[in-house]
């Protein structure tokens, strides 16, 4: 469990205090994949680097598995950091070392295992990330996705309890991003590893995260289960992320719908209701007609969801709206 208790961070720049993270409290349960999303300068990298004390907080308390990390001395901090792996946007591999030697580096520096034990652990890790036949290659011989897999293997070398991911997929193409996210999901599931990742891409959050915190200007403006936050956004920053992801311009959409007759509603379906024949049933029962103006079906981790924007005319509209609500479908009246 990772817990922030009123943690804040301020930098001193040219004689002025610049707040990077305002007083923040949050909790990440063991085994969760927790996402931090925000635009550049939102404070998400600062928050992530506070977890393993690459940055020291200006105030507040950070507790990991009932241990006050902010109170650790140098020796305790070295011990603690062996329990926390980290992967980076630009991989941070040593170009003069082979893949195997890059993965072995944390174990070599720790000095606790024999050479044969290190070799055995490295072989196991490379097999896990699908690079067993790349051990003797150098980083320059690898693709971006392969480099990040080496970074993941290296981060897992000391058998950490926590994995921190700093924009780990932002330098990768969409197909490679999907394969790396699938690997992270497998690692989380098989090792019960707690993962905290930061990103500016909603698709990353949707694919792998259980919980999400949305950040803006050093403040967590909204947090909760991914489906709750992104299917029913409350804060303007969250709504902007949703609109960017769906490529929606509210002003353009309002103009497009201006001459469409009837009431305009947006329905959000989750789980089994996503594929249920609800529209036809409601139309027959209440006598309404509907036109589909926009729609999508996607998944949040393993849960399907769908969104439809409808123009509804005729019949008993209030009965139709009540029927949608009774079917556990979230309805937003746009006009």
Swiss-Prot record:
Give the subcellular location. Answer: Cell inner membrane
Q: Which GO terms describe its cellular component?
A: plasma membrane
Q: Which residues cross the membrane?
A: none
Q: Which Gene3D superfamilies match?
A: 3.30.70.260, P-loop containing nucleotide triphosphate hydrolases (3.40.50.300)
Give residues annotated as binding ATP.
Answer: 38-45
Asked whether the UniProt record includes ATP-binding among its keywords, one would answer yes
- Reactions that this protein is recorded to catalyse: L-methionine(out) + ATP + H2O = L-methionine(in) + ADP + phosphate + H(+); D-methionine(out) + ATP + H2O = D-methionine(in) + ADP + phosphate + H(+)
GO MF annotations for this entry?
A: ABC-type D-methionine transporter activity; ATP binding; ATP hydrolysis activity
Record's CDD domains? Answer: ABC_MetN_methionine_transporter
EC main group? translocase
**Keywords carried by this UniProt record:** Amino-acid transport, ATP-binding, Cell inner membrane, Cell membrane, Membrane, Nucleotide-binding, Translocase, Transport
Q: What is its EC number?
A: 7.4.2.11
Q: Can you give the residue ranges of the ABC transporter domain?
A: 2-242
Coarse class of the protein's main subcellular location: membrane
Superkingdom? Bacteria
Its membrane topology, per UniProt? Peripheral membrane protein
Function noted in UniProt: Part of the ABC transporter complex MetNIQ involved in methionine import. Responsible for energy coupling to the transport system.
The subunit field of the Swiss-Prot or TrEMBL record says:
The complex is composed of two ATP-binding proteins (MetN), two transmembrane proteins (MetI) and a solute-binding protein (MetQ).
PANTHER family, per the entry: AMINO ACID IMPORT ATP-BINDING PROTEIN (PTHR43166), METHIONINE IMPORT ATP-BINDING PROTEIN METN (PTHR43166:SF30)
Q: Can you tell me which family this protein belongs to?
A: Belongs to the ABC transporter superfamily. Methionine importer (TC 3.A.1.24) family.
Protein name (Swiss-Prot/TrEMBL)? Methionine import ATP-binding protein MetN 1
Q: Which organism is it from?
A: Pseudomonas fluorescens (strain ATCC BAA-477 / NRRL B-23932 / Pf-5)
Phylogenetic classification of the source organism: Bacteria, Pseudomonadati, Pseudomonadota, Gammaproteobacteria, Pseudomonadales
């Amino acid at each position: 469990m990772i817990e922030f208790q009123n943690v804040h961070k301020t930098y001193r720049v040219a004689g002025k205090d610049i707040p990077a993270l305002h007083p923040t409290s949050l909790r990440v349960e063991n085994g969760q994949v927790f996402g931090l999303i925000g635009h550049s300068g939102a404070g998400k990298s600062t928050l992530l680097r506070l977890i393993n004390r690459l940055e020291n907080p200006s105030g507040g308390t950070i507790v990991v598995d009932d241990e006050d990390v902010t109170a650790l001395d140098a020796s305790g901090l070295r011990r603690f950091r062996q329990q926390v792996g980290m992967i980076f946007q630009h991989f941070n591999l040593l170009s003069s070392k082979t893949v195997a030697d890059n993965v072995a580096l944390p174990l070599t520096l720790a000095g606790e295992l024999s050479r044969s034990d290190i070799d055995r652990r490295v072989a196991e890790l490379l097999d896990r990330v699908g690079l067993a036949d790349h051990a003797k290659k150098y980083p320059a011989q690898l693709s971006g996705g392969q480099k990040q897999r080496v970074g993941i293997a290296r981060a897992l070398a000391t058998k950490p309890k926590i994995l921190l991911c700093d924009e780990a997929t932002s330098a990768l193409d969409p197909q490679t991003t999907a394969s790396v996210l699938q690997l992270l999901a497998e690692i989380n599931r098989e090792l019960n590893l707690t993962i905290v990742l930061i990103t500016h891409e909603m698709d990353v959050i949707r694919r792998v995260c259980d919980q999400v915190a949305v950040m803006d200007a050093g403040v967590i403006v909204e947090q909760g289960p991914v489906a709750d936050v992104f299917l029913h956004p409350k804060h303007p920053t969250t709504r902007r992320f949703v609109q960017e992801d769906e490529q929606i311009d509210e002003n353009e959409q309002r103009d497009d719908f201006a001459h469409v007759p009837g009431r305009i509603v947006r329905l959000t379906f989750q789980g089994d209701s996503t594929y249920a024949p609800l529209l036809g049933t409601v139309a027959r029962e209440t006598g309404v007609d509907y036109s589909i103006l926009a729609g999508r079906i996607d998944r949040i981790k393993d849960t399907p969801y769908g969104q439809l924007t409808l123009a509804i005319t005729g019949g008993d509209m209030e009965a139709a709206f009540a029927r949608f609500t009774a079917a556990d479908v979230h309805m937003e009246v746009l006009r």
